[in-house]
Each structure stands twice: as structure tokens, then as C-alpha cells.
């Protein structure tokens, strides 16, 4: 029994087997748990609509031919938001880890998927941050009602009314921005001039994929933030907790950044070659999976009976999860599994057969941080780039340590794990060895 109802928990060895059952997708589970058929919860119910295809298309677009433009947007906006959140104060000053991390991640995610105009719109950033929080409260309150009464209850519950208002306002903001772009294009064409502006962002990709088919722009954008902001914020927080105050590790990360930027310049190639940083993030994710529970590396709902190889059956319409505890309690898989070893996966890359699976964005039954199979996190390559670009700015430009008395305990909420939401970090400006804010090369 979990906080959201009965579920079957399967052992880790079933991970590869369940991968074969791709028709048993996560959409069923998400819609059921978050009342996707009730007004206000529309971003949780995009599974059978064009919005889901739009979200997946944008995720692929962000790490394909548009990756260079994505890197440019991430770097430009990282410089802005890091300076805004961390300041240029050379003296130690406290910052609240969660509020700082979520603001930075929401800003960068919007820069790529909603465009520069919306990423610098504080109202839009507030909505993308608050929507998931409101949804969690509203969903929990609706769980207390009988299923048949939930739609009616949502009409008067303040949290549900607020949720609907946030979706409506999101649609208005995105539609207004998209319409302004269309008007600009029309005016350019009427003037007989060639259209020269290409935005290389999610708003453009949505129109490109939809090809005139109707869709809900605000719902689509909120669906993106549901999968991108909270989980990535949580990952960034845990990484900062794990490296803060570790001077030897910070120095090693800085040496790697400086060496590769000096050789390749500040480009997307730099990000690919940051192998120690890549390993460090993956190790942090191993010990504290992001956005998933201690027992839920993979979450599915059976669309039909699933017959397992040992004779076991997962009945139709029953939610099930696969334990990921082997990631931190299996010493045969990961020697000294409870210790944080930043170079663990860097060393694992040298082992034949692990050259690819040891990379941050790779999928493996041994590391379920992103899930597994066709329904694994489609935005993992973008998240890897986003977090690395941001960390380059944060590590090169600032010293970090935990506030005295802060032990950054992982919090458990039902079957979920969360980086300490009350932790405080101390930060001070330092002079970076290479410039990350100049013209990109």
C-alpha cells in the first residue's frame, strides 16, 4: 500500500523483462494518479492527444540538429540566471537550495522550450514552478473523495480552482507569444521581405510538428515543465549537496572544465567531453534517484495481464513498479555501494562492455535513474546538457559549502525521494579561469 493506492512492487531482476512490455505505458499510471480527465489536470492527460507527440518531438529536437542552438540558449541564460540568483558577492552568503535551484532550472527550461521572451517573463516562470506544487496538493485532496465524486469536488476545492486558473493563464501567455510571432511573419511577408527570424525553440517546434492541427499550447508547455523542472531541480540540488565543501573534487571538476574549454572552446562539444562531471552527476543520481521512489525505478500500469517468466502475473489495470534499491545496496554491482565516488562511472567506462552504459544519459537495468525502455525519460539528453552547462557556470564562478549544521538529509514522501528541501548552501563569487559569458565559438 502506497500513498497513492495499492501497487505491485517487482524485484530489480524483472527490469529487462518488463522492458518487453512497452504497450504497458506510464501514461495510464499518470492519468489515473493525477486525475487527468478533470479540468486543471489536462497536462497529465496528454497521452492520447497530439500534446504527447509534441512533448516527445520537442525532447528529440532539443538534442538533435538543434543541439547547437539549445547549447547557446542554455549558456546565455545560465549566465543571466546564475548571476541573478547567486550574485557577485565575494563573501560567503547563504542561499536556500531549493528555491535557487528551481528558479534556475525553470528559467533554462523555458529558454529552450518556451523561448527567450517567456523565460524572462516572471509570471510565466512563477506558473511553471507553482503548477506542479498546486497539482500535488489538488491531487491529494481529490484522492480523499470517491472516484465518481471527484469531478464535482474539483469545482469547489480551492486547490483545483487555482489549478484550472493556472492552466488557463498558461494558455493565454503561450498563445499571445505564438500569435505575436505569426503576426510578425505575416507582416514580413506582406512587406515582400524574406523571413529571417528562426527561433530554434519549443514554440517553433510545436508549430512545425502540428502543421495546422489544433492543440493546446499552454497545456503542452506545462506538460513539458512537469517532466523537466521538478525532477531536474531535484537532481541539481542533490549534486550541489554532494559536492559542496569537497575542495579536492571541486578543483578536479574545475581543471577538467578549464582544460576542455581551452582545447575546444565553449561549445556543445565541451559538454560531451566533461567525463568526470558526467560521472559525478550519474553517481549522485545513483544514490538518490531523481523524482522516483526508493521502490519505483520504473512505474507502469498494466494495460492487459502481464505474464512473467517465473509464472507470476501482474493483473490488468494494476499499477506496478520495479524496485531500484539494487542501485545502492548491491555490493556486487557497485562496490562500497553507499559511498559517493564521483569518478565511479568514469572508471566504469574503461571496463569493456560498459563504455556506453556508464554515461549519464544511457539506459541500463543496473541504473534506473531515467527508467528503462521506450518509455524512459525522453528528455534525458537535454537534462544532461542543461545540468552540465549550469554546473560549469556554478563551479567555475563560485565556491560552495554547506551551511554549518546542514546535513542535507534525503526526504521520503510515500514512495518518492526528494533532495532536502530545507537545506542551505553557502556561496561566494570567485574569479573563473576561463570566460563562459563571451561570444560562443
From Swiss-Prot:
Top-rank lineage group of the source organism: Eukaryota
Polar residues composition-biased segments: 186-195
Biotech relevance: Campesine G features good insecticidal activity against the global honeybee pest Galleria mellonella, which supports its future application in the development of biopesticides.
Stretches the record annotates as Disordered: 175-195
Claim: Repeat is one of the keywords in the record: no
Record has Magnesium as a keyword: no
Cofactor: heme
Chemical reaction(s) catalysed: campesine D + reduced [NADPH--hemoprotein reductase] + O2 = campesine G + oxidized [NADPH--hemoprotein reductase] + 2 H2O + H(+)
Positions that bind heme: 377
InterPro entries on file: Cyt_P450 (IPR001128), Cyt_P450_sf (IPR036396)
UniProt GO MF annotations: heme binding; iron ion binding; monooxygenase activity; oxidoreductase activity, acting on paired donors, with incorporation or reduction of molecular oxygen
Signal peptide from the UniProt entry: none
Pathway recorded for this protein: Alkaloid biosynthesis
Swiss-Prot/TrEMBL GO biological process terms: alkaloid metabolic process; secondary metabolic process
Keywords per UniProt: Alkaloid metabolism, Heme, Iron, Metal-binding, Monooxygenase, Oxidoreductase
EC identifiers of the protein: 1.-.-.-
Family: Belongs to the cytochrome P450 family.
Alphabetized PANTHER family for the sequence: CYTOCHROME P450, CYTOCHROME P450 MONOOXYGENASE AUSG-RELATED
UniProt function note: Cytochrome P450 monooxygenase; part of the gene cluster that mediates the biosynthesis of campesine G, a dimeric indole piperazine alkaloid that shows good insecticidal activity Galleria mellonella. Within the pathway, cpsC catalyzes regioselective dehydrogenation reaction towards C2-N1 of the (2H)-indole ring of campesine D to yield the final product, campesine G. The non-canonical non-ribosomal peptide synthetase cpsA catalyzes the first steps of the pathway by producing L-tryptophanal and L-valinal from their respective amino-acids.
The protein, known as: Cytochrome P450 monooxygenase cpsC
Organism the protein comes from: Aspergillus campestris (strain IBT 28561)
Gene: cpsC
